[in-house]
């Protein structure tokens, strides 16, 4: 039930809750979305360093070298370094 659909009214000297149309599919969907949003926000605040560090560094990695022999990796590094050395007028940073 959403707080927007609940109305508190005094009933027989007690405070009760009179909920109108709480079975409406739109109200149910809005409640589910609200709860999911709250959960995701809490997780984001708890783990934001891990999450954003993964996206920041994970996307900068370049091609995967898994299963590639070390000699080919070294050859690739030399090619990348020669590409940097060829253009002395501009500084180019390549992270491997």
Curated annotation (Swiss-Prot):
Gene Ontology CC annotation, any one: virion membrane
Residue positions with a glycan: 20
Basic and acidic residues: bias regions: 71-80
Region (Disordered): 60-96
Subcellular location per the Swiss-Prot or TrEMBL entry: Virion membrane; Host apical cell membrane
Residue stretches spanning the membrane: 23-43
GO biological process: protein complex oligomerization; symbiont genome entry into host cell via pore formation in plasma membrane; symbiont-mediated suppression of host autophagy
PTM sites of type Phosphoserine: 64, 82, 93
Assembly and oligomerization: Homotetramer; composed of two disulfide-linked dimers held together by non-covalent interactions. May interact with matrix protein 1.
UniProt name for this protein: Matrix protein 2
Organism: Influenza A virus (strain A/Memphis/101/1972 H3N2)
Lineage: Viruses, Riboviria, Orthornavirae, Negarnaviricota, Polyploviricotina
Gene that produces this protein: M
